[in-house]
A protein has these predicted regions:
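Exposed, interaction-prone extracellular/peripheral surfaces
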Residues: 2-41, 54-59, 68, 73-114, ...
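Short glycine-rich loop/turn motifs that provide flexible caps or phosphate-binding loops at active sites
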Residues: 44
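Small-residue-rich anion-binding loops in enzyme active sites
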Residues: 50
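N-terminal juxtadomain amphipathic helix
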Residues: 61-63
Length: 322
């Protein structure tokens, strides 16, 4: 238990340092859809002057800057840059299936939560508004949050202090995401690799048409390679018989889950969404930094939302519950 807490503290320190180690131009360029406070592309903002021109028939009278007009002796229309703030919706699967174990010894919900913290660290640096939503078969709860990263961590920790005795309801969570009206809002969905089937992918394709979307996909342990731990089914509590633990079974599970992961990545990529897949918090951190770094190289200095390159933890393996 001590080792696990020490590891959790270590990854949290890395996450806290993430926003400070990335320079502001890097954050601005790399995040793409994670823009926070940034110049709006709408006209007639309220900050830096972008353009001044004489008033023409058809221009709205409210666009006239009277001080500039007085200096020029004629009506002048001023185009200004204005700052806008993006919203990030973080949707967390809190079904009991998320108590499945990963290769690192962490539970799936712990890895998923650390993935959300990584997004929050950079989003809050950009002054984004964050909405946190937790869902299982019993309820869907929007958790109030206001403040900085420390407050977000506290809010997330409190939200995850639960008995974890209700099954997941991914359909309801995706339906919640589908009803988010702000089409400029980024949706970050955190779940494990067993949650998304064809019906869910169909809904996600619909969401991806209207919203930028990132899926945090946690790979759980392969039960046929967990030799030092007794693996049990999360729903029934039945343990895996020792006679079934062999290399052939392990290879078959790895092959099947690698295929499913590749299928999920292809589906998300086709819709312009991003997959971040890992089997531990450390692997998730590396995947996150790699994704941001490649996006940095591709997006240049543009402040418009850009599709983030897909990065997957190839070493991460999936598995059943421990």
């Amino acid at each position: 238990m001590t080792g696990r807490m020490t590891g959790d503290d270590a990854i949290r320190r890395k996450i806290e340092a993430l926003a400070t180690t990335l320079t502001l131009p890097t954050v601005k360029r790399a995040l793409g859809t994670l823009e926070g406070e940034h110049p709006s592309h709408r006209r007639f903002g309220s900050d830096d002057i972008m353009d001044i021109r004489p008033y023409e028939p058809g221009d709205e009278a409210r666009r006239i800057d009277w001080r500039t007009s007085a200096r020029n002796g004629r009506p002048m229309v001023v185009h200004r840059q204005r700052q806008v703030t993006s919203r990030v919706w973080m949707l967390m699967d809190t079904g009991r299936e998320m108590t499945g174990s990963c290769e690192s010894g962490e539970m799936a919900w712990q890895v998923a939560a650390n993935g959300l913290r990584m997004f929050a660290a950079l989003s809050l640096r950009r002054s984004d508004d964050i909405s946190l939503v937790c869902a299982d078969s019993a309820s869907i709860t929007r958790v109030p949050f206001h403040g900085g990263f420390a407050q977000f961590e506290h809010t997330l920790d409190r939200a995850l202090e639960r008995p974890w005795n209700h099954a997941r309801n991914m359909d309801a969570l995706l339906d919640y995401a589908r009803r988010i009206s702000d089409r400029n809002a980024l949706i970050v969905l955190a779940t494990d690799e067993h949650a998304l089937g064809e019906p869910q992918l169909a809904t996600m394709r619909t969401i991806a048409r209207t919203h930028p979307m990132v899926v945090i996909d946690v790979a759980t342990i392969n039960p046929f390679v967990a030799r030092r731990r007794a693996v049990a089914d999360a729903d029934t509590g039945r343990r895996l018989p020792a006679l079934l633990i062999n290399a052939v079974s392990a290879s078959e599970v790895d092959t099947h889950r690698s295929y499913l992961a590749a299928q999920l990545e292809a589906e998300l990529q086709a819709g312009g969404s991003t997959l971040m897949r890992a089997s531990s918090s450390e692997a998730m951190f590396r995947t996150f930094v790699h994704t941001v770094s490649i996006s940095l190289a591709r997006t240049g200095f543009s402040t418009r939302p850009a599709t983030v390159v897909h990065a997957r933890d190839t070493a991460g393996k999936a598995g059943d519950r421990a």
